[in-house]
From Swiss-Prot:
Assigned protein family: Belongs to the DRM1/ARP family.
Keyword Transmembrane: no
Protein's recorded name: Dormancy-associated protein homolog 3
TM regions (residue ranges): none
Comp. bias regions, Pro residues: 88-97
Signal peptide per UniProt: none
Residue spans of biased composition, Basic and acidic residues class: 104-118
Residue stretches of biased makeup (Polar residues): 32-43, 127-137
Length: 137
């Protein structure tokens, strides 16, 4: 019991019990009323935790939210887009014209084997690599 006495803390469990742990004091400041089926929940009811407080009085709080709409607002239709009726372009969408952006539209294009053979036949330095020459000794 000595350890339990040392661990007892007023901030956690309230004042120390008078005789033994089974006889904890019931505080009148923590009284909870049984719900009578009203619209109030336990979180919405007022509780007092002070020593010299008056009996509880139910405080009903009402809140309202008003949404102010602009003068030209039409509730049934979607707002007009400032960009017009064209959808936004994705970097992965096909280009509008192959000549519009230089080599940029073809940057992610997969090269076919026929392109590789055309470059090799043209004498391009970036053509397919051939096997290294064999050296005789």
């Amino acid at each position: 019991m000595g350890l339990l006495d040392h661990l007892w803390d007023d901030t956690v469990a309230g004042p120390r019990p008078e005789n033994g742990l089974g006889k904890l004091r019931k505080h009148h400041t923590f009284s909870f009323r049984p719900s009578s089926g009203n619209d109030q929940s336990e979180a919405g009811s007022a509780r007092s935790y002070g020593e010299d407080s008056l009996p509880e009085e139910a405080v009903k709080v009402t809140r309202s939210i008003m949404i102010i709409k602009p003068p030209g607002y039409q509730g049934s239709s979607a707002p007009a887009s400032p960009a017009g009726s064209t959808p936004p372009l994705s970097p992965f969408s096909p280009p509008l014209s192959p000549f519009s952006g230089g080599k940029e539209p073809f940057r992610f294009r997969r090269r076919s084997t026929s392109d590789a053979f055309e470059k090799a036949a043209g004498g391009s330095e970036t053509g397919p690599r051939s096997s290294p020459p064999t050296y005789g000794m």
